[in-house]
Amino acid sequence: MGRAIAITTRHGSVDAWRADPLDGAQRGALVIVQEIFGVNEHMRTVVERYAAEGYVAVAPDMFAPVQPHVELDYGEDGFARGRELASALGFERAVDIVAATAAQLREEGHATAAVGFCWGGSVAYLANTRLGLPAVSYYGARTVPFLDEPLRAPMLFHFGADDASIPEADIQAHRERQPDATVHVYEGAGHAFNRDVDPRHHHPASASLAHRRTLKFLEVALA
């Protein structure tokens, strides 16, 4: 069961959703970086699923410096507002919030990685290049402008082959410009294929395979 906590950041106190393994057997810690829709019920569930796999998982309220406690729906209005909030926050502040969250987890003695989804996938990538965190990026569509930043830790990318927001040329750019990263592409999957509360986007087979690959990656990266 998750609970609300607070993270002290350079941009003020940021609320977060945290879940810990019930059996106390901890594999490490994860900063879960939200989609543009906020730390909503789906993201809280993601946090709790990783806790069930043995990880201390924390999803900070990334938009808190702009508008705290955002939970948007998946319609056009929610998408538009989420893009506005992501733009207003900017990547610099986003990385700062991840840094503060990771620092708190490391102070507790946990080896820490970042796992991000959609916009959060691009933030997770920057947490690798700028903070040195092992990272997993699910369909991060805003990573291409930053691909010349060198990786500082293991990196895993998941992309849907049918994701209109991330064309094949962009996926190939990830392979070519970050050859040390692992890139997986899922046939039949589009954007947000892990979002199981959204039947328009969820692709169960791809989500299941990506999750298994993520767990294997984290097992090695946080060893």
What residue ranges belong to the model's regions?
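N-terminal cap/leader regions of alpha/beta-hydrolase-fold enzymes
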Residues: 1-223
